[in-house]
Amino acid sequence: MDALYNAAKPRVVAIGGPTATGKTALSVALAKRFGGEIISADSMQIYQGLDVGTAKVTPEEMQGVPHHLVGFLAPEQAFSVADFTTLAGKTITQLTAQGKLPLVVGGTGLYITSLLNGIGFTPEKVDPAIRQELQARLQAEGSQALYAELAAVDPGYAAKVHPNNTPRVIRALELYRATGRKMSAEREAARPAEKPYRSLCLCLTCRDRTLLYQRIDTRCDRMMQSGILEEAKLVYNHRDTYRTAAQAIGYKEFFPYFEGTADLESCLAHLKQASRNYAKRQLTWFRRQTDAVWLYLEDGNLEQQAAEQTEAFLAENNA
């Protein structure tokens, strides 16, 4: 298979789509079949000790396939899309040099599209005073106040960001307050004339939205059985330092239970609803990727379909 990796541009297979669609299992099967390794494109699975609530791949699920960018960062540390594209790019270079197929797998669409499109990000030094001021305002006024400020100064970027995606809202406000530059303009300037990789993007979903929601509910129930409450309590107890995790779906839904303002059943119902809403946003993001190949769970035989797509992609001539 070495000849398949001699192109000037490395070949990369990405697997995306909403939560609870079987991306992990499919990626492991393809990695074993095509001699690949997996690069996680999940903004929460990077953290150490946060396994259940992030649906982090287990050693059993890995089946001996090496996984990169999983569980390597302390929860106190911030991690940006710039950090991801830098580390993932280095990993792709290393794997390609070894004759291995890089598979970029996860539900964080921004990570995948930024990497495959070669969007460059220049990490800026954050002024601690600006960040502290924004964090204080978040605590006092809530995420909607920060989002309203972003919509006022950079409506183009605000339209692409969910109001509850606080880390991205804060990052854009930090940039604007520190430099006067808009994140929307930074994004446009960062887009290269040519993509750095030859890529195949496979996206998994269900034709029937009800089936997807059932799978999400089942996953949430399994998380309860696997100890998500203990992880959520850990995050709650460290919410001032685990700032990213404290905003993540899977943990913040249980904070009212720890505060004595809601029962466990209602918190679990809230988690299921938040996860379904997140899946809708993931679908919206990935549907904008015009070159994505969609695979539907109802059709069955996903592994064979994905293998055929991958085989054809790898056999394409290098011109």
Language-model segment annotations:
Residues M1-A319:
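Phosphate/pyrophosphate-binding catalytic cores of soluble transferases and nucleic-acid-acting enzymes
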